[in-house]
Amino acid sequence: MILEHIGLSQINGRLVVLDGVKGVQYDERAELHLDDGSTRVGRVVRVDGDRCVIQVFEGTRGLSLVNNRTVLTGHPMMMDVSPELLGRVLDGLGRPIDGLGDIYPVARRDVNGAPINPVSRVYPRNYIHTGISSIDCLATLIRGQKLPIFSGSGMKHNELAVQIVRQASVADGSDFAIVFAAMGVKNDVASYFRESFESCGAMERVVMLLNLANDPIIERIITPRAALTVAEYLAFDLNKNVLVILTDMTSYCEALREFSSSKGEIPGRKGFPGYLYSDLASLYERAGIIKGSKGSVTQIPILTMPGDDITHPIPDLTGYITEGQIVLDRGMDATGLYPPVSVLPSLSRLMKDGIGAGYTREDHVTLSNQLFACYAKVQDAKALASVIGEEELSQSDKQLMAFGRAFEQEFIGQGNTDRTMEQTLDLGWELLATLPRNALDRCDAATLDKYYEPAKARISKANNK
């Protein structure tokens, strides 16, 4: 039911208060019509009897307590969706800002989405190729998964996001699209994202939503919801496999904290609202696959850990909800290694069911386990070398140290190279081939005969040239 109200009871910052209104719903969309003919959009953030509080996205400057006309639309924030969204740049509310004209919608969807019946969910299988060895081999991204990237301020997570957008694909060649939402970014970062996508030719399969640092915080809270609404339309209406990249979730959570404080809510840990967990879950749980649909929604939320603290509420709660994490290492980043993925704390909890024979290659699981095991031993050898010096290490530990350096420089630090899964797995075996066969205790004899020995032969042949 549409309601109209003349005048405002109070104006407080970005909040306006209406008295004497009935039938208003929480989260309802409001339109405020000013004397000069302009219209501002707001959202009902509190209802108390016949009083409601509206947060105005564009701010309250110029509003009048007497003559302002407020229209309560009777529905929540909606998003216009259409196949024409692909290749377009939108603001945080889903409105075009690329100068290419309006989008003619084929449907309007609630940005809050609809809850997915757990019974109708399909268990995620099949992987999404990123072209990044440390992810594809050791923390494989599975369709329908939510796999966050834990980064730190000043690290190269923006470059990594661009590389994933440029290289991401699905192995079976089915329709693939990317929804990229940037929240609270500076103008130069927004320009970097846009120019990077356009220069590499990826823009035609990308829907881009930009919420800048000087945009309203309430818009920042809507942005990931608008992005996921677009993704759900592309996936479940158009049967596309959709990858959603949300950066930076820390900006989103800080906007939520500021918004909660403005409403006078009791703060929780580090000032964040007590409902931070359920709010993040309402976003992350929109990933998945539904029975009867050929599409999927996969999420990569990117967040910068305040003070590089993985126990901070934002990464801590994100880790509870999602299915693994990719952790970027500041020490690696300082040495110029890119991408600076710290493989030992990184994991993908769903990769075991989406790799191996029929998905990637039969040796993938074994190779991944062996690389993890050997690199963990490298850390032990490094710790010992820091005490007694590398020259005093045993021969086996020296071999491990050499393997560790090669693994970091060649396997992890691949730069902007796009590697196929085959190239990644072959490189993994070539690195393991620098170690003696009896050191590979996670591999069976048949796998070693098929992959380790040919890799060792290739290395010997290359060294003899």
Which residues are covered by each model-predicted region?
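P-loop NTPase nucleotide-binding/switch module
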Residues: 68-70, 77, 84, 96-145, ...
